A protein has these predicted regions:
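N-terminal transmembrane alpha-helices
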Residues: 5-42, 56-71, 75, 100-107, ...
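Transmembrane helical elements of multi-pass membrane transporters/channels
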Residues: 16-35, 137, 148, 171, ...
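Transmembrane alpha-helix boundary and packing residues in multipass membrane permease domains
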Residues: 21, 25, 37, 74, ...
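Alpha-helical transmembrane segments and their lipid-water interface positions
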Residues: 28, 32-39, 62-69, 73, ...
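Short runs within selected transmembrane alpha-helices of multi-pass transporters and secretion channels
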Residues: 69, 138-156, 164-175, 193-208, ...
């Protein structure tokens, strides 16, 4: 069901629109968490470390996938908000075609270069074979990942956040069952974990494309439809490329940090891998909700309702802030128990590593509510330069400080780089929001 985000109370609209997205990303995270849970519990600590080590590299592919999602979603939602449905349909098909071409190129790069990247990040010898096998299978499934994410972006652009939630609920649950089947029953090891994700994402991709095609066809439009437009691809790229670069830089930064962590041994890698999975449940949730705020801003911008864009800030901070506080309490109170879920016979070093990481960063989660709400509004309004600046400042500080602090304070020094980077990034985001979107809406209101 398509939904118009340009009418109704901004708070109510955002909560109703974004909560299914929050549920969706929780189920999306089940893919990665299930992989790590099964690897750690049914195979061993080294298998958990191998999957976690590979995960940082898969984030590069996810960065491109997320950029395609955002680029298509923001442009489609803008034309949907303006009720220019024929152009909206051109944006949908152009986004899908462009994604297929990009995905093909990335598959070739991934299959040829993943092993070299594993060597570059100083993957321990005992983890190399499993890490490489996991990455190879993951790369083969990139078309499913990319097309599914673009389809999800189209759903949210049309105001429908419930359909992706239903797809993910079913496929994520199935992924857990297939993970256990392939590893416990068929004894496929780390490869079984990867093939389970490949299979379940493939089914989700095909079904979501079928439904989105029917949904787009049902939108009334006049005139002959253009299936591909270079001009439209350019509009999508203007939004997608900064998002891809932003996410890619974050991924590269995470890989650099992973290489620093790798120098401390397999037990530290395993503990960090488990804690990162938990941390990414929140980060990915907030990022996805930020893209929902972008859709809200883009639809209202297309409809010429700038004052509603400004009103979305308070509603967004309340939504994201409430989620941040819940996760802060959860990780501080039950961090050890959650980390134990990933390990069958954990070493004390692995558990202590993960727990220290969570206890260091969780108290600062609330900063992200302000940052990602501001970023979402700026991205939805096409202010990509400012959006990138906030993210890159955060990333740069995290990478530099992780390297410096690890030399002075050991592995625990690495974790301190997160809150420092978040603080600076949040400060910049708030300044940019106040001097751009907030001021523009305020000036329009007083005219």
């Amino acid at each position: 069901m398509n939904k118009d985000l340009t009418v109704g109370s901004p708070s109510k609209v955002l909560w109703q629109f974004c909560l299914p997205m929050f549920g969706s990303i929780l189920f999306q995270q089940l893919y990665n968490i299930a992989d790590s849970l099964v690897a750690g519990k049914l195979i061993g600590e080294n298998a958990l470390a191998a999957v976690g080590n590979s995960y940082e590299i898969t984030l590069i592919f996810l960065a491109f996938s997320f950029g395609c999602n955002i680029g298509g979603s923001v442009i489609v939602s803008r034309y949907f908000g303006a009720k220019d449905y024929n152009t909206m349909k051109t944006a949908v098909s152009t986004a899908l075609i462009g994604t297929v071409v990009l995905c093909g190129a990335l598959m070739a790069v991934g299959l040829l270069g993943c092993r070299s990247l594993l060597v570059l990040i100083r993957t321990p010898a005992e983890l190399m074979a499993d890490s490489a096998e996991y990455l190879d299978i993951y790369t083969l499934g990139l078309p499913f990942l990319f097309l599914y994410n673009v389809a999800t972006g189209i759903f949210t652009a049309l105001g429908d956040s419930r359909t992706p939630f239903l797809f993910l609920a079913v496929s994520s649950t199935a992924n857990i069952a297939v993970d256990v089947l392939f590893v416990a029953a068929f004894d496929m090891g780390v490869a079984g974990v990867a093939w389970a994700t490949f299979l379940c994402q493939g089914v989700s991709c095909v079904l979501s494309l079928w439904v989105v095609a029917r949904r787009v066809r049902a939108v009334p439009s006049e005139g002959e439809r253009v299936w591909f437009s270079w001009k439209m691809l350019g509009q999508i790229a203007v939004v997608a490329i900064p998002s891809i670069l932003q996410q890619s830089f974050v991924s590269v930064g995470n890989i650099i940090i992973q290489s620093v962590v790798n120098s401390f041994g397999a037990s530290v890698i395993a503990g960090f891998a488990a804690a990162t999975k938990l941390n990414n449940v929140l980060i990915s949730s907030l990022t996805t909700l930020g893209s929902g705020i972008s859709n809200y801003a883009s639809q209202n911008l297309g409809a010429g309702k700038n004052e509603r864009v400004r009103a979305g800030f308070g509603a967004g901070v309340k939504l994201l802030g409430s989620i941040c506080l819940c996760f802060t309490a959860l990780y501080l109170l039950a961090g050890r128990q959650l980390l134990m879920l990933f390990m069958n016979s954990p070493t004390g070093e692995a558990i202590n590593t993960g727990l220290t990481f969570l206890q260091t960063i969780a108290p600062f989660y609330l900063l992200l509510a302000f940052k990602l709400t501001s970023d979402g509004l700026m991205r939805g309004c096409g202010m990509m330069g400012r959006f990138m600046a906030t993210t890159l400042s955060d990333l740069f500080l995290r990478v530099v400080l992780a390297i410096l602090f690890s030399g002075w304070l050991g592995v625990n020094g690495i974790w301190l780089s997160w809150p420092v980077g978040w603080f600076v990034g949040t400060l910049l985001s708030m300044v940019f929001y106040r001097t751009s979107i907030h001021r523009q809406a305020e000036e329009k209101t007083t005219l």
